[in-house]
Every structure is written in C-alpha cells, then in structure tokens.
Amino acid sequence: MTQQQDELDQIKSQIQEHLISSGNYDIINKQLKLQLYESGWFDKVTQLANRELQENSAHDTAVSFDQLFSFVKPKAEEMVPSNIKEDVLERLKDYLDDVIQ
C-alpha cells in the first residue's frame, strides 16, 4: 500500500468515527431505511431473494447464505432508487462541508 493510500484510509476512518460519534451516522442511516421502506425496496429485495431460493429449490439445489447474498447484493444495490442515492449523497456532502469548514 502506498503512503497516499494509507493517508486516504486514515482520513476515511476519521470521517467514519466522527460521523458515528456526532450521531450523524444514525440520522442518515434511519432516514435511508425509511426512504427504502417507503419506496418498496425492502419488499422488492425480499421477492428477489425468494425467487432465487424457489428456483434453486425447484432444481433440488441447496443455496448457502453466502451464495444468496452474492446473488442478491449487486441487484439490490441497482434497485435503490436514484432519488434516494442522490439524497444520501447530498446529506453526506452537507455533513462533510460542515466538518471541513
């Protein structure tokens, strides 16, 4: 790892620690969960996982949690509505602007 990468990792760690200690992490996290719930994202991801389990069950194929997670995770990330992604990014930018100034 390069010195620049080490410094970047250290800054990232400090930001994460400050986000948590200031309570902003909980605020952003709760708002994100609410927005995802209201958008139906949780239901859609549950349906996706259930379909995958049913398909594998129909073929008498056992699926581990890790396999299911590997299948669902990228699709679930793509399913997050763009307005929610933008809102969370805006909240993080606002937080960073306040911390840096």
UniProtKB/Swiss-Prot annotation:
GO cellular component: DUBm complex; nuclear pore; nucleoplasm; P-body; SAGA complex; transcription export complex 2
Keyword Glycoprotein: no
The organism's place on the tree of life at top rank: Eukaryota
Localization per record: Nucleus, Nucleoplasm; Cytoplasm, P-body
Gene Ontology terms describing biological process: chromatin organization; mRNA export from nucleus; protein transport; transcription elongation by RNA polymerase II
Keywords: Activator, Chromatin regulator, Cytoplasm, mRNA transport, Nucleus, Protein transport, Transcription, Transcription regulation, Translocation, Transport
Record flagged with keyword Transport: yes
MF annotations from Gene Ontology: transcription coactivator activity
InterPro entries membership: TF_ENY2, TF_EnY2_sf
Protein family per UniProt: Belongs to the ENY2 family.
Function, in words: Involved in mRNA export coupled transcription activation by association with both the TREX-2 and the SAGA complexes. At the promoters, SAGA is required for recruitment of the basal transcription machinery. It influences RNA polymerase II transcriptional activity through different activities such as TBP interaction and promoter selectivity, interaction with transcription activators, and chromatin modification through histone acetylation and deubiquitination.
Assembly and oligomerization: Component of the nuclear pore complex (NPC)-associated TREX-2 complex (transcription and export complex 2), composed of at least SUS1, SAC3, THP1, SEM1, and CDC31. TREX-2 contains 2 SUS1 chains. The TREX-2 complex interacts with the nucleoporin NUP1. Component of the 1.8 MDa SAGA transcription coactivator-HAT complex. SAGA is built of 5 distinct domains with specialized functions. Within the SAGA complex, SUS1, SGF11, SGF73 and UBP8 form an additional subcomplex of SAGA called the DUB module (deubiquitination module). Interacts directly with THP1, SAC3, SGF11, and with the RNA polymerase II.
PANTHER family: ENHANCER OF YELLOW 2 TRANSCRIPTION FACTOR
Protein name: Transcription and mRNA export factor SUS1
Organism encoding this protein: Debaryomyces hansenii (strain ATCC 36239 / CBS 767 / BCRC 21394 / JCM 1990 / NBRC 0083 / IGC 2968)
The encoding gene: SUS1
